[in-house]
């Protein structure tokens, strides 16, 4: 599963799954464009890759900003002249609240970052990807694909379901260009994203469901790791997955089978 000589764009590369994937792809030989919403977080990931002997550039951009994403890919083209892998991973949990309490602005922000951001990440990659073909991997979630019991996650789940539909449409459209498009659906993974989730008054709509032994059967209830997800990203980016496209892969330790 070596990626020697290949170039990868990773969004949300400053932390969590994105950072782990950027490092994993670099260890496999890829040159990595580490993109995050802040310059500092992108720079730290790029520096870590270079410290391991890899090649990386840091890019700061809001994935929902069309001009910024177009400029980011132009920088990749100038730097390395090619693109082989896109990991469209950036996203937010947003606000989790009842439908009555969730504001239109909160709904729109989650959909804009997660779904429009994915569209722009793929759209502006195509001029480079079409030159040689390649692999696009999109981070969705168990929410909106198998799990619908997390109260208040209507905006988040809708954005994640939308990513799956988008990926399937893109996979068919881009197959003739030898571009594969697949989706990963992580369950409970130990990252920092939960810390930025705003949950409001969910007690009023939460169904009283309990899992005494924890929600993840494969790990005796505990979460998976970002490194495990990064290994899946590497597989889908590599030639080992050369005949896989338009497919969701759940990486959740059977959580969604229990909790959905």
Question: Where are the language model's segments positioned?
Answer:
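Short, small/polar-rich loop/turn modules that mediate ligand/substrate recognition or access, typified
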Residues: 175, 180, 244-246
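Active-site helix of classical SDR
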Residues: 122, 159, 167
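Residue(s) in the substrate-gating loop at a strand-loop-helix junction
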Residues: 141
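Conserved glycine-rich cofactor-binding loop
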Residues: 7, 14-16
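Substrate-binding pocket helix/loop in short-chain dehydrogenase/reductase
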Residues: 97-99, 103-108, 212-214
